[in-house]
């Protein structure tokens, strides 16, 4: 499948995978890509498959000459689902912001190298993290 930008989807998936353990290929559809980061374990006592994590997820959509994004912070529960919830612990918020900024920078640099821009979605109003200089 070729995206509106003219780049084959399979090539983009390969490049996105090289950015790190962020892309969830099974949740990517058509011209949309899904990334997430399980940044902070809520409680290490349960078995690994039963643990919950604080983290973020990002949806990326291919446009003609750019990709648009929206992201959320929240809880990745033991069933493997994301829920947007407020996070009260300062250290956790700082870790999430750091990992999101790091990923955003890598993603932006990759897209620029391909002649594409990275911009917030028109319907993405909430920007709690300063992602670009």
UniProtKB/Swiss-Prot annotation:
Pfam families: Crl
Region entry Essential for activity, spans: 99-122
Compartments (UniProt record): Cytoplasm
Any one biological process term the GO annotation gives: positive regulation of DNA-templated transcription
InterPro entries xref list: Tscrpt_reg_Crl (IPR009986), Tscrpt_reg_Crl_sf (IPR038208)
Signal peptide range in chain numbering: none
Broad class of the protein's primary localization: cytoplasm
Listed GO CC annotations: cytoplasm
Key words, A-Z: Activator, Cytoplasm, Transcription, Transcription regulation
Described purpose of this protein according to its UniProt entry: Binds to the sigma-S subunit of RNA polymerase, activating expression of sigma-S-regulated genes. Stimulates RNA polymerase holoenzyme formation and may bind to several other sigma factors, such as sigma-70 and sigma-32.
Family: Belongs to the Crl family.
Cross-referenced NCBIfam families: PRK10984.1
Protein name: Sigma factor-binding protein Crl
Organism: Salmonella arizonae (strain ATCC BAA-731 / CDC346-86 / RSK2980)
């Amino acid at each position: 499948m070729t995206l509106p930008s003219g780049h084959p989807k399979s090539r983009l998936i390969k490049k996105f995978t090289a950015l790190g353990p962020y892309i969830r290929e099974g949740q990517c559809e058509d011209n949309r890509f899904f990334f997430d980061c399980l940044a902070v374990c809520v409680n290490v006592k349960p078995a690994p498959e039963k643990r919950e994590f604080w983290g973020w997820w990002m949806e990326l959509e291919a446009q003609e000459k750019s990709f648009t994004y929206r992201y959320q912070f929240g809880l990745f529960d033991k069933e493997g689902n994301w829920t947007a919830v407020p996070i009260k612990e300062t250290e956790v918020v700082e870790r999430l912001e750091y990992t999101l900024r790091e990923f955003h920078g890598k993603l932006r640099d990759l897209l620029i190298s391909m002649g594409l821009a990275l911009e917030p979605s028109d319907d993405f109003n909430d920007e709690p993290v300063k992602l670009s200089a």
